[in-house]
Amino acid sequence: MYSDNSQRKLTKAVTLSTLKKMKADKEKITCLTSYDASFTNVMNVAGVETILVGDSLGMVIQGQDSTLPVTIEDMCYHTAAVKRGNTNAFILADMSFMSYSKPEQALDNAAKLMQAGANMVKLEGGSWLADTIKLLSQRGIPVCAHLGLTPQSVHKFGGYKVQGKSQDAADLLLQESLDLVAAGADILLYECIPTELGKTLTDAVPVPTIGIGAGHHTDGQVLVMHDMLGINLGHTPKFVKNFLTEGRNVTEAFEAYVKEVKDMTFPGPEHGFKS
């Protein structure tokens, strides 16, 4: 999949089949958020296999205090921009808050994101999403289900807190994972869960798992681009590492991230959570 040059540029398109094979081969999957054409192009050069057009743009681009104000129109705009800068990476696009509260509504909005250039849509939630995921899957729309800490539910959680710490909570996450895979989810993304739970869940499901603050056992890793470049508003989550250090430029920072995820040196123990 990679060329022989030091930049590890992707030489052919990454597909869902590619990601499933990477899980089977135990090759780590790399993912970063991007919101425009320019950074997307650099990520392709650096060899990042998957790009997430995240609703995190509400915070890092728009300056909001959460992801809730982001609209489906915002997501379509940025997905189209990312598509224009992309060559071979696999593009995931977030469905914004309340854009998938009903299955038919979700289908309409997911179609907009796919038409804008997404290869897959991502939804936050548990087993209640099963009917929605089943409908999207039946209509040919690949789905990534986001479990654990789901930022669109931040007010219900009472803040950005680690999820799945108790045995009951861990058991619930496992059951929800199995329910959503049975409904047709093609990828599961876990956020802010204990490292060992990340391993349990990854071993239990047949689809690729991507983690952010979920330890090193998940099949892949994702970070918000601004966080891993040290561009933030004063708060750096525990699971983040600044790769724009040691005199690196942006391309080198992305390359270092890819290398450390592949080598399984990132995330380290200091980036994970305990039960």
Swiss-Prot record:
Binding partners and assembly: Homodecamer; pentamer of dimers.
Protein family per UniProt: Belongs to the PanB family.
Chief location bin: cytoplasm
Catalytic activity: 3-methyl-2-oxobutanoate + (6R)-5,10-methylene-5,6,7,8-tetrahydrofolate + H2O = 2-dehydropantoate + (6S)-5,6,7,8-tetrahydrofolate
Protein EC: 2.1.2.11
Catalytic residues, chain numbering: 191
Any GO BP: pantothenate biosynthetic process
UniProt cofactor(s): Mg(2+)
Positions contributing to 3-methyl-2-oxobutanoate binding: 55-56, 94, 122
Full protein name: 3-methyl-2-oxobutanoate hydroxymethyltransferase
This protein's encoding gene: panB
Organism: Marinomonas sp. (strain MWYL1)
Pathway: Cofactor biosynthesis; (R)-pantothenate biosynthesis; (R)-pantoate from 3-methyl-2-oxobutanoate: step 1/2
